[in-house]
């Protein structure tokens, strides 16, 4: 049986809003598989929805560069917010971003190798580990960028007004869509959600035939919620992003979004009380 760690329980709590013991029980039943635990909790009504994985615990910066129909986002991490504001750290991060946009198609491995000497020297000087973690690229006729405090970076590519695309980039930063259009949602994602919704309806007492019919409406809502053009526009919730784009004669072909520390978790010392409580049951 998989080990159910305190950090795993904590992540499940953060993503579902359920109680500590409910989360521990769900993880035990799912043999430590957090995604399966979330699915089971949704089906049983313990969790109405779950936040996407992406524990943001690392420090660092996201930088953006755009040049001739090509844009890049680069993430560079460090251990503390103090170092994230250090002139030497920011100088290296900016050099990495400049190199990335000038060398289309560069891999993260190539970036790391190119700047390893400078990185190692800075680590020795400051005494804190740091890494060039991610690079993401986008191409398009018009590209707009939005950086939120150097912690979230978004690039949106499309046609039309750069100013309007920047507004959309701000929306992407806030709302975290996963796809551009509802029809872009992959079949496996749709089927996975469909089965969850059918189980939820059946568990509420509905016959399978009725449950399956009910789910069709829910699926349309689901694909709209996870797609950019189907979401309510943050600057005008009375209309969708898609409707707004049509009104300003602008379209989106693609977007990329990076947030500092996504998927990285630091060991936390303030979880001891809950760990102790877990051991008593």
From Swiss-Prot:
Its main location: cytoplasm. InterPro entries: EF-Ts_dimer_sf, Transl_elong_EFTs/EF1B, Transl_elong_EFTs/EF1B_dimer, Transl_elong_Ts_CS, UBA-like_sf. It is found in: Cytoplasm. It comes from the Bacteria. It holds the Pfam family EF_TS. Gene3D superfamilies: 1.10.286.20, DNA helicase RuvA subunit, C-terminal domain (1.10.8.10), Elongation factor Ts, dimerisation domain (3.30.479.20). One of its GO terms (molecular function) is translation elongation factor activity. Keywords: Cytoplasm, Elongation factor, Protein biosynthesis. Residues 80-83 are annotated as: Involved in Mg(2+) ion dislocation from EF-Tu. GO terms for cellular component: cytoplasm. NCBIfam families: tsf (TIGR00116). Associates with the EF-Tu.GDP complex and induces the exchange of GDP to GTP. It remains bound to the aminoacyl-tRNA.EF-Tu.GTP complex up to the GTP hydrolysis stage on the ribosome. Belongs to the EF-Ts family. This is Elongation factor Ts.
């Amino acid at each position: 049986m998989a080990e159910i760690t305190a950090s795993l329980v904590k992540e499940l709590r953060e993503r579902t809003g359920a109680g500590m013991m409910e989360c521990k029980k769900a993880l035990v039943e799912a043999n430590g598989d957090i995604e399966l635990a979330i699915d089971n909790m949704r089906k049983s009504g313990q969790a109405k929805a779950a936040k996407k994985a992406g524990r943001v615990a690392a420090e660092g910066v996201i930088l953006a560069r755009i040049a001739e129909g090509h844009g890049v986002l680069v993430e560079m991490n460090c251990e503390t917010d103090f170092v994230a504001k250090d002139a030497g750290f920011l100088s290296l991060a900016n050099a990495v971003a400049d190199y990335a946009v000038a060398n289309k198609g560069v891999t993260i491995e190539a970036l790391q190798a190119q700047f390893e000497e400078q990185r190692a020297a800075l680590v020795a000087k400051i005494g804190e580990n740091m890494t060039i973690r991610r690079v993401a690229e986008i191409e398009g006729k018009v590209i707009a960028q939005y950086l939120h405090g150097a912690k979230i970076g978004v690039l949106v590519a499309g046609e039309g007004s750069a100013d309007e695309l920047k507004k959309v980039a701000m929306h992407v930063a806030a709302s975290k869509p996963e796809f551009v259009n509802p029809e872009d949602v992959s079949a496996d994602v749709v089927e996975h959600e469909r089965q969850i919704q059918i189980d939820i309806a059946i568990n509420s007492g509905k016959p399978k035939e009725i449950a399956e019919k009910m789910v069709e409406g829910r699926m349309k809502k689901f694909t709209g919620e996870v797609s950019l053009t189907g979401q309510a526009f943050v600057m005008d919730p009375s209309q969708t992003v898609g409707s707004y784009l049509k009104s300003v004669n602008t379209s989106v072909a693609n977007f990329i979004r990076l947030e500092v520390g996504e998927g990285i978790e630091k060991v936390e010392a303030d979880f001891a009380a809950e760990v102790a409580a877990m051991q008593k049951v």
